[in-house]
Amino acid sequence: MKIAVGVRLAAVGAVIWAGMASVPAMAAGKVCDVKTYGAKGDGTTKDTIAVQKAIDECTAGKGGGTVEVPAGTYVIAPIVLKSNMTLHLAKDATLLGSPDMTDYSKVVFARHPTVQPLVGSVNAENITINGEGTIDGNGHIWWDYVRGVRNSGVLGTDHPRPMGVVFDHSKHIRMEGVTVQNSGFWQIVPYYADDLVFRNLRVLAPLSPNTDAIDPFSSSNIVIDHVFASTGDDNVAIKSGEINSPGPDDPSKNITITDCTFERGHGISIGSEIAGGVQNVHVERVSFKGTDNGIRIKSARDRGNDVSNISYKDITMENVKIAIYITEFYASKDPEGEVPAEPVTRLTPKFHDITMENVTATGSGVAASIVGLPESPVLGLTLKNVHLEGKTGMSIAYAKVTMDNVTVKADTGEAIKVAPTATVTRK
């Protein structure tokens, strides 16, 4: 199949990105069963060497091949995927992260010191991870450690935690059917990657710190489809760059998120670290159930850039704390009243050309909060057929908003509060 990215074409509620290279099905090649290479799969023996040997030998030739992981629990330290391979996880097969923290070598990732991810690729292409099995980061070891450090009050003793699956400067990637859960930190991370499909996945780690489900970072041409996620942080977080980034930073762009269900977590976020910008994101037919946020676009003066051509369609939210949250004051309290403008810099967030259509939210804490900067207000925000119910209503400041068939019901206070710094046009 081909999934196209590049030119946005609207067609009966669908968005197609034209020009994206097809994600290849792996050609017939070697089949390397990890047990043939000595893996035990008994839940106790460390099988890292055997699994990595299967990967290395299966990809040694030009044709590549399939690494088979049969039913069993395989304890592994970090493994590295290679070009032209399929990692097939059979039903009841689990790759389980080693509980030994010393198994995770220190590395620099995204300009920061950290440790190796459990499963990763670097400068690779044509990789598929599929099947009905599980990649389990065994994250409770890391979460308990971090909670203990944070509760100790001792500064400077935090320990970097391993991510689950990272595609670093890699392309033509497909993940389908598997479960990724309990990573020490972020769970699935395309980093400066291109042409990726994540379909029919379950990503799980509720009530755990910083366990974002899927975090595209300065990556392009991505499909996230039929994903169920329940995590301890963002269900999806689209990023590019970092706080006070020295640059240069590539944008994240050409991303579609369709037919997904998100439960615990912080919803779909763009930001907050977006020094490279984010463009061409389309979200359609997504359900949020009990998340902290639903639709969230967030940044601040020290980490922003251009965020544009963002659309949401056919979105339902139930019992979400904040249904729609757009802020250019992230990590600070949103201002009350007018605040002084500051000079526009390379890192000033610039949110514009954002559309939300056919959006409903019931049982929310806050229906919506939309706050731009005085020097860079939110521009071109269009709400069409949007119906929100919350304990409190919608507030708008430093923004220009067009509303077409919008209703807001608030248990207390004004349903829609428009600050003098904002302009609302009703059709």
PLM region descriptions:
Residues 16-25:
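C-terminal segment of classical bacterial N-terminal signal peptides
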Residues 24-427:
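Extracellular/periplasmic carbohydrate-active domains that bind, remodel
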